[in-house]
Amino acid sequence: MEDLKKSVTNIVHSMYNFDCSEIVSLTRPPKPEYGDWALSLPLKLASLLKSPAIDIAQSIASALLELDGVQDVYVAKPGFINLKLSREHTTGIISEVLEQGSSFGRNTTQSSKKINLEFVSGNPTGPLHLAHTRWAAVGDSIARILINCGADVTREYYINNVGNQIHLFSESVYARALSKSLPKDGYPGEYVKDIARRIQCEFPNIIDLSYEDAIKIFRKRSWQIQIEEIKKSCIAFRVNFDVWFSEESLHEPDRFGKSQIDKALARCKQNGYLFQKNGAFFIRTTEFGDDKDRAVLRSDTSYTYYAADCAYYLNKINRGFSDLVILVGADHHGYVKRFQAMSNIFHVDSENNRKNVQVLLGQMVSLKNKRQSKREGNVIGLSEIIQSVGVDPLRFWFCRYPIDTPIDLDEQHLKKRSNDNPVYYVQYAYARTRSLIRSANLLQMEKFGFFPELLVHETETALVSLLYDYKTVVIDAARFLQPHRVVRYLESLAGAYHKWYDKCRIIPRKGILDKSEAELVNTRLELNRAVGQVLYNALDLIGVSAPERM
């Protein structure tokens, strides 16, 4: 489809000297008899070119008829174009899939980008919870899709190891080591006791130290041990971060006594966006749509979180990233304007160097029939939910929905081995393709050749059309940072495959009777192989396994 879109773009440019690349789109007609693709572009061009849509449609249609692979073009009022591709062109996708194998679907649409993708970034004060699990699945899948489209992607985890929560966490661990009650608003949970025991094993005499000396050790080791556990959980969930960035490093002075935060605020001052009010310092973020100017230095000379955010942003820019993508919870909606403000403030002298900053706001996740409370210490952690449900169902389910859609997770449903469980339905389709291939290998069917013109059943036409769609689905998923497009495609392809499997006997029960039947069987087996390959490739984009047997 992308090649066809490029052809349409070139036709319009040559006819009208107009670049329509941003508005051209191809869709599937509501009925197969209307053709393979529908184009509503003339309706959009009519007002732009000051010409009747039907006339534009007729002109474009005439040029489309000259393209290789286009069998017929129909124009309908007020300015729609329907295209029918030749049988050879559409079924050619089967050979393309089989020739390219695991590379099918890869492209270079994002090759000009060096992207920093920050996600999860849960505070190192406890295990990752359900919402973090969602960000892990979605963030890693976005990375996989972008890499598939040629981008240079760095997966990054920001460790919030500075501030009151870290202090309270270390105090909680220290209290558990002394078998004392928790401080006010302290952290409950068995994991706090586990960390306390581990620190005591590392430093056997720590409880004999003064509070001042002991708390220094607890402050450092508590979050470090928790991060070690978080790393293990992420790896078990098939998420591997390239960079674990410590917020603490932003506060550390260089040999001249200046921290990265100091340098970032100096840059803000140099560009005219830093001002003082009531003894504190603020950045003029309201000039870029924020609801209020953000404090960066309090009157007691301590830095705010936004000061560290500014330094972290500048750190990413200095590492050469062209695009910054940040996944946060919906409760961080204010981050959008703040990060956009940074992009303007730090690049005021150069419009061309302004960075593309995208903040993706994700809705929360609830667990059906289970109440969770972090303060009560009964939050469901990533490791626990993996043990209960498994990696594949979780990753599939979390990527199945747009990130701004709340999810109510049903553990029992995800454990079902039935067709009403989407991940089982898709994986079972792949396992079926592999089972047929094993059976075909015993029959040595390859010698009978491949004749795509034999694929005339309506279920085969539907399958071929879906194979044809795959590359565009991947390109759009990367462009819009939406893994759910891949998941929904997988469900459509699996559904079409199961329907084909049930309607068409691929390998006859009574054996192959003659040469013509053998040719049809082998041709269908090639379609089967192509579907299996695309299922495998798409599952890999969301980090879900493709089982050989089920």
Swiss-Prot record:
Gene Ontology biological process: arginyl-tRNA aminoacylation
GO cellular component: cytoplasm
Its EC number(s): 6.1.1.19
Catalytic activity: tRNA(Arg) + L-arginine + ATP = L-arginyl-tRNA(Arg) + AMP + diphosphate
Motif 'HIGH' region per record, residues: 122-132
Keywords noted in UniProt: Aminoacyl-tRNA synthetase, ATP-binding, Cytoplasm, Ligase, Nucleotide-binding, Protein biosynthesis
Annotated compartments: Cytoplasm
Molecular function GO labels: arginine-tRNA ligase activity; ATP binding
Pfam family membership, one: tRNA-synt_1d
Subunit structure, interactors included: Monomer.
Family listed: Belongs to the class-I aminoacyl-tRNA synthetase family.
Classification via HAMAP family: Arg_tRNA_synth
Protein's UniProt name: Arginine--tRNA ligase
Native organism: Tropheryma whipplei (strain TW08/27)
Gene of this entry: argS
